[in-house]
A protein has these predicted regions:
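Sequence/structural signature of beta-propeller domains
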Residues: 1-163
Length: 163
């Protein structure tokens, strides 16, 4: 469920030619999310095994898009799990906001169709991985990247009521 003109923005193949990797330009528009998905600080990195066609999804925290207006422009594979990600806004320099980040999914949690997240259920028809009965993007809503990551970490905490 992508927002109009906010789809898969970059594609790359890992150096060993085993995996196609893409990244969504911004957050997915999930059920229950009020307004635009653009200011939600979670995009997705999607991997597809070229041998088995297995799909995995990983959350990528955008740098405060509600404030910075950034979205993802490109992704480049440095290894099977390490990527350069270009975030940018639509402004020209010197006011523009353009940065390149390193994203490492080596120890990241798959939130895609094969997700095995404690307390989570994957429902493609309802926006993907559900935590506390809501899709991830709807759950974190419009917030900072730090607040979104903190919220997701608190859900994974052994003291959370769903554990």
């Amino acid at each position: 469920m992508r927002s109009p003109n906010q789809g898969m923005e970059g594609l790359t193949i890992t150096p060993d030619d085993s995996t196609l990797v893409g990244i969504m330009q911004s957050a997915l528009k999930t059920p229950g999310l009020e307004g635009s998905a653009k200011p939600v600080p979670l995009a997705r990195i999607v991997t597809v095994s070229l041998a088995t066609k297995a799909v995995k999804e990983y959350l990528y925290p955008l740098a405060n898009p509600a404030e910075t207006k950034v979205a993802v422009s490109e992704i480049t594979a440095l290894s099977n799990t390490l990527f350069l990600v270009d975030e940018r806004d639509g402004e020209l320099q010197p006011r523009g906001n353009k940065k390149v980040y390193i994203a490492d999914i080596a120890d990241a949690t798959d939130v895609g169709p094969g997700a095995n997240v404690p307390g989570g259920v994957y429902r493609a028809d309802a926006g993907g991985l559900q935590l506390d009965g809501k899709p991830v993007e709807t759950l974190v809503g419009v917030s900072s990247d730090v607040a979104a990551v903190d919220k997701l970490r608190s859900l994974a905490s052994p003291s959370h009521p769903s554990r």
